[in-house]
Regions:
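A conserved mid-protein helix/loop that constitutes part of the nucleotide-sugar donor-binding site
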Residues: 17-22, 196-219
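Donor nucleotide-sugar binding/catalytic pocket of nucleotide-sugar-dependent glycosyltransferases
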Residues: 120, 124, 128-182
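Short, structured helix-loop element that forms part of the nucleotide-activated donor/catalytic region
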Residues: 224, 229-251
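Aromatic "clamp/platform" in nucleotide-sugar-dependent glycosyltransferases that forms part
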Residues: 259, 278
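A short hydrophobic beta-strand element within the catalytic core of glycosyltransferases
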Residues: 273-274
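Short hydrophobic beta-strand element within catalytic cores of glycosyltransferases
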Residues: 295-299
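A charged, aromatic-enriched C-terminal amphipathic alpha-helix characteristic of glycosyltransferases
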Residues: 338-366
Length: 376
């Protein structure tokens, strides 16, 4: 089949981008042609894809996205693709991979003034075009919580929803030489075995709750704080958060490592995953920590927080978020014996399907492609 994938921006350290690549790679391996339409592509081009850059100039983000939608529609009309897959909410796609949360749910009450706001009208309209009753788009869902919200707001029928399991890379599972990798990384960055290493992973530091983590780090008892280090992997305004760390008196304890390709090694080298996100459709890093045997402390708003509760591989901060609760729970977990959390995480990783999302997504793409060809 001739497949077209559309997403606004590609950068190699984004969760959505990683999901796209894994799905597109399987499509290519199965003999399908892969065309990709983007506004921006950061990093090396994949030789297996035909990448089409659609530059969009506008003073506003929603204006750029609107330009992308228009250009994309013109390109698609000129081509004869069997299936068009959107990784953002794009009107007219055959399939939408639902990586983003429900937009209109963030508004408790939609006011008349909001309906006049061009930004609101654009994004609400794009979401309606994908999930609304007049749409034929099939939605690949990765979050139970978000599925409930989309049903609530749009009444989307079950026959337009495909629930996918998580898609953790099997290579992230704890290897036999985990101890060796742990020691090597700690030595490389001059940490000793007695140091408590707390890991955060993800770009978009405000959304991921890095400020919350810095506040909790600063609140640790002095002796515990002296041996505790927060390692933040991801891309954002590093200078701003380094200044925040200095303001809170934990500059020496907070290490901003940037976007990285060796996250798996850090999952093995650290003692705790901290993910106090303000919102997260899934929270893929939660399950990456799970399969690596790393205990975790996460907020309930994350889609994958349910797996922490089911596995008993860590602790969940219930909503509404309380900084005081985080400040109390972090030192408790740092000084606790972590053996049971580690065992629970690895047992859960062995018994649950946390891995097959890309394969199941491709199965859905192929099935929908067959149905569309018969409909023609």
């Amino acid at each position: 089949m001739r497949l077209a994938f559309a997403l606004y921006k590609y950068f190699p350290f984004g969760g959505l981008a990683r999901d796209f690549v894994r799905i597109a790679n399987i499509c290519h391996q199965k003999g399908h042609s892969v065309d990709v339409y983007v506004m921006e592509w950061n990093g090396e081009f994949n030789p297996n894809y035909n990448v089409h850059l659609l530059p969009c100039e506008n003073w506003s983000n929603h204006g750029k996205v609107a330009s992308f939608h228009q250009q994309l529609n013109e390109k698609l009309l000129a081509e004869d693709y069997d299936v068009v897959i959107g990784f953002n909410k794009i009107p007219g796609v055959d399939i939408y991979y639902a990586a983003d949360p429900c937009y209109i749910d963030r508004f408790e009450k939609i006011t008349f003034a909001q309906t006049l706001n061009p930004r609101f009208r654009f994004y609400a309209g794009a979401e309606e075009a994908v999930f609304g009753p007049n749409s034929k788009t099939i939605c690949l869902m990765i979050s139970d919580k978000q599925t409930v919200l989309f049903k609530k707001h749009y009444g989307i029928s079950d026959d337009r929803l495909v629930m996918l399991p998580p898609g953790i890379d099997i290579n992230r599972r704890r290897p036999d030489n985990a101890g060796e990798i742990r020691n090597k990384l700690r030595t490389k960055y001059q940490f000793n075995e007695q140091d408590n290493l707390v890991l955060m992973v993800g770009s978009g530091f405000k959304t991921k709750g890095v400020d919350r983590a810095l506040a909790a780090l600063a609140a640790l008892p002095k002796t515990l704080r002296a041996t505790t280090h927060l390692l933040v992997l991801g891309e954002d305004n590093l200078k701003r958060y380094q200044q925040l760390a200095a303001k809170k008196g934990v500059k020496a304890n907070a290490h901003f490592m940037g976007g990285r390709s060796d996250v798996a090694d850090f999952l093995l080298a650290c003692d705790l995953l901290l993910h106090p996100a303000r919102k997260d459709n899934t929270g893929t890093v939660i399950l990456e920590a799970m399969v690596a045997g790393l205990p975790m402390l996460v907020t309930e708003v994350c889609g994958y927080a349910k797996h922490v509760l089911e596995s008993k591989a860590g602790e969940v901060l219930m909503s509404p978020f309380s900084q005081q609760s985080l400040n109390e729970k972090l030192p408790e977990m740092l000084v606790a014996d972590k053996k049971m959390w580690i065992k629970s995480a690895l047992d859960y990783a062995d018994s649950e399907d946390l891995y097959s999302m890309p394969e199941k997504a491709v199965d859905a793409i192929e099935r929908i492609g067959e149905e569309l060809s018969h409909a023609d």
